A protein has these predicted regions:
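Low-complexity, Pro/Thr/Ser/Gly/Ala-rich linker/spacer regions in secreted
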Residues: 1, 246-261
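Extracytoplasmic/periplasmic beta-strand context in beta-sandwich domains
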Residues: 3-6, 37, 62, 273, ...
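Short, conserved sequence motifs used for protein processing/export or organelle targeting and
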Residues: 32-251
């Protein structure tokens, strides 16, 4: 069981240093069992879709929800965690990923293994967070109601000024993107799921140059038919890429981070002859040619647009073409096999 805590915060909010402190406490005390997400409001780190979603669940700042339950002050995170972590979830989530540093495209797989039968509208959400986020200017300085110690101790914030200058603070667990939306895609799974079933959904993000993937985490949230987070998952991007990208179905409606405007993606690329080819074309063929123009593989595009190619191609450079149902070439990519 991984408990997910979503904290509403903002640099303008003087009491939000309490939230920062308790998010740190939770990460230090329950690492691997707690997935913390700092959802910013009214500052340079805001993700509008996420901010609006969390805003509908709270009455003020700082505040938050644990596993999408009742509103709770950040000081109540430990108690809510200890209550929820004892629950046996209906499924566990495994994070996988592939990151292409050249194109800055991140593909994420969330593999859900069910250990009991479920039914109804279950959903799966993918969140990206980043640690050590910082910037320059007054909007990056943190208001601090605990300055001077008059409001008691708060993890060292009582020893810092208000505002805390931008060059003296950085921000952790910062929500960077949420997909496909705050609520998730309706009916992400079949209406009835059997005990032992496994389902994998795939998500695609374009990573801006000022994000540090070495400091980023992938958090999965399985939302049950009551709108509560049944279980979560957490891993660094590096851990997820070490696991690799699991085969699955691409989710649609990525919020803020639209799927790349490309008819085809190949990953990994370069590779050892084993790869996944993803295309937005729902009918047609994918053909692979060597540099001499010889056809070495032809595959019919399946309904989900996902092709696993395991032909163990020889080392070299290949050209991959996507053909639509009228046999027209609609996309071409260079493939390198090492």
């Amino acid at each position: 069981k991984v408990v997910v805590g979503e904290e509403a915060t903002g640099t303008w909010c003087p009491w939000c240093t309490r939230g920062t402190h308790f998010m740190h406490v939770m990460e230090e005390s329950y690492k691997g069992y707690w997935a913390g997400i700092a959802v910013h409001n009214g500052d340079p780190m805001v993700v509008s879709e996420y901010d609006q979603g969390i805003g509908a669940l709270i009455g003020g700042y700082p505040s938050g929800v644990v596993d999408r339950g009742a509103e709770v002050d950040p000081s109540g995170f430990p108690g809510a965690f200890l209550e929820n972590v004892q629950m046996t979830p209906a499924a566990i989530i495994t994070n996988g990923a592939f990151y292409d540093a050249t194109t800055a495209e991140l593909a994420v797989s969330l593999k859900v293994d069910f250990s009991k039968a479920v039914s109804g509208d279950w959903r799966l959400i993918c969140v990206l967070t980043e640690d050590s986020v910082h910037g320059t200017g007054a909007d990056w300085s943190q208001a601090n109601a605990y300055a001077g110690g008059g409001s008691g101790p708060m993890g060292g914030f009582e020893n810092l000024p208000s505002p805390i200058p931008f060059d003296q603070i950085s921000y952790d667990h910062v929500a960077r993107a949420i997909s496909p939306s705050f609520e998730g895609k309706a009916n992400s799974f079949p209406t009835s799921v059997a005990d032992g079933d496994s389902h994998t959904l795939l998500y695609s993000f374009s990573v801006p140059a000022d994000w540090n993937t070495d400091k980023m985490h992938i958090i999965g949230m399985l939302i049950n038919d009551q709108g509560v987070t049944e279980n979560g998952s957490t891993s660094s991007i590096n851990e997820a890429t070490a696991h690799g990208l699991d085969n699955g179905s691409w989710i649609t409606g990525v919020t803020l981070m639209d799927m790349p405007d490309k008819e085809m993606m190949i990953y990994p690329n370069p590779n050892d002859g084993n790869m996944v080819i993803k295309t937005n074309i729902d009918a047609g063929l994918v053909k692979v040619f060597d540099v001499e123009g010889r056809l070495v593989n032809t595959t019919t595009i399946p309904a989900n647009g996902m092709i696993e190619l395991n032909d163990n191609l020889e080392t070299g450079i290949y050209i991959v073409n996507v053909y639509n149902k009228m046999n027209e070439v609609v996309a071409t990519e260079k493939l390198m096999v090492k």
